Each structure stands twice: as structure tokens, then as C-alpha cells.
């Protein structure tokens, strides 16, 4: 399965993106800070793409 990391500090935006990516068939890991994202990348080396700070 394709895995995506979402890094967004605004919870409502992050939730919207996560819900829609999951509906599209992606496995999603999410972080609210850069530190969280780095830890998630270490724990999930199979992340294929990261989406950062969506506007």
C-alpha cells in the first residue's frame, strides 16, 4: 500500500487531508510538528511521499 506522511499544524486541515487520502486508498501517517514527523519517518521507512504545511 502507498504510505503518505502529512505534516500540518492546523488540525482541521490535517484531518481533511487525511480523511480524503484514506478514502483514495492511501495509508496515512500524520504529524503536527516537525519533531513528530521525523520520529514517524524513522518508524515508517516505507513512507513514499510527505506533504508539508498545506495552505
For the regions a protein language model found, what residue spans apply to each?
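Conserved acidic carboxylate
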Residues: 8
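Charged docking surfaces used in two-component/phosphorelay signaling
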Residues: 15-23
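Conserved Rossmann-like nucleotide-cofactor binding loop
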Residues: 12
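Short phosphate-binding/catalytic loops that engage adenosine nucleotides
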Residues: 26
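Acidic, metal-coordinating helix/loop segments flanking the phosphotransfer/catalytic sites
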Residues: 30-49
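The short loop immediately C-terminal to the conserved phospho-acceptor aspartate in CheY-like receiver
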Residues: 54-55
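Non-catalytic signal-transmission and effector/linker regions of two-component phosphorelay proteins
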Residues: 1-5
